[in-house]
């Protein structure tokens, strides 16, 4: 927010790309700083936030303490995004998985990956419960790669150079996780298998 204000940019929209709490718990702070900015998302993202926000706050409130949001904002639903400084922005998602949208900027050949793209750290898989859900995620990554992007912005990363190689990382990680899940009898076995497959990767608490 400080950078936006320092640049004297007129923030008009905040696009919420995913329904996990880390994507919307801070919206009240952004709204207070930029009250004129519209907070928007796809219909599916707004629906999933509305359906789970109170339960998610109950889960996280104790851990967050005074940092817990005092207001939970559900985004306004949109089908399209406005252009920014002449650059068109397109909401993309696989037809079988509307819960994982991402933003494609054709003029820059850039993807803002949303919740589907993580780099250099164990991927949070707790909300991806079944093999079918992993397969849908893999298809989203395939859809991204078919666009042949020059730049990919991950949602979660330790460090990133914003290159398309992040999609290779997610693709390989999901394949390893899917294989390990099929062979594991419980969560401990699955965690051990992923730690063995990716011994140098930080973020083991995500498993």
Predicted regions and their residues:
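Divalent metal-coordination and catalytic microenvironments
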Residues: 4, 18, 39, 103, ...
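Metallo-beta-lactamase
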Residues: 47-99, 106-107, 148
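Active-site metal-binding motif and surrounding structural segment of the metallo-beta-lactamase
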Residues: 1-40
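Divalent-metal (often Zn2+) His-rich catalytic cores of metallo-beta-lactamase-fold enzymes
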Residues: 104, 110, 135-193
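Compact alpha-helical subdomains of small soluble proteins
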Residues: 37, 186-207
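Active-site-proximal loop/helix segments of hydrolase catalytic cores
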Residues: 88-147
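Active-site environment of divalent metal-dependent phosphoester hydrolases
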Residues: 19-24, 46-49, 98-99, 118-122, ...
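Active-site neighborhood of phospho(di)ester-bond hydrolases with catalytic His/Asp-centered motifs
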Residues: 12-20, 40-43, 111-114, 147-158
């Amino acid at each position: 927010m400080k950078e936006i204000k320092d640049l004297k940019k007129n923030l008009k929209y905040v696009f919420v790309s995913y329904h996990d709490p880390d994507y919307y718990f801070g919206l009240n702070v952004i709204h207070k700083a930029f009250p004129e900015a519209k907070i928007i998302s796809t219909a599916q993202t707004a629906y999933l936030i509305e359906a789970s926000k109170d339960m998610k706050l109950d889960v996280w409130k104790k851990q967050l303490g005074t940092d817990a949001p005092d207001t939970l904002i559900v985004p306004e639903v949109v089908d399209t995004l406005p252009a920014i400084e002449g650059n068109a922005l397109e909401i993309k998602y696989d037809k079988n998985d509307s819960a994982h949208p991402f933003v494609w900027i054709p003029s820059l050949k850039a993807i803002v990956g949303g919740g589907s793209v993580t780099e250099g750290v164990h991927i949070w898989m707790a909300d991806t419960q079944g093999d079918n859900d992993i397969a849908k995620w893999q298809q989203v990554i395939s859809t991204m790669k078919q666009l042949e992007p020059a730049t990919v912005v991950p949602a979660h990363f330790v460090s990133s150079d914003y290159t398309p190689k992040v999609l290779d990382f997610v693709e390989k990680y999901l394949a390893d996780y899917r294989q390990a899940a099929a062979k594991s009898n419980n969560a401990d076995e699955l965690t051990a298998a992923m730690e063995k497959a990716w011994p140098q990767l930080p973020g083991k608490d995500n498993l």
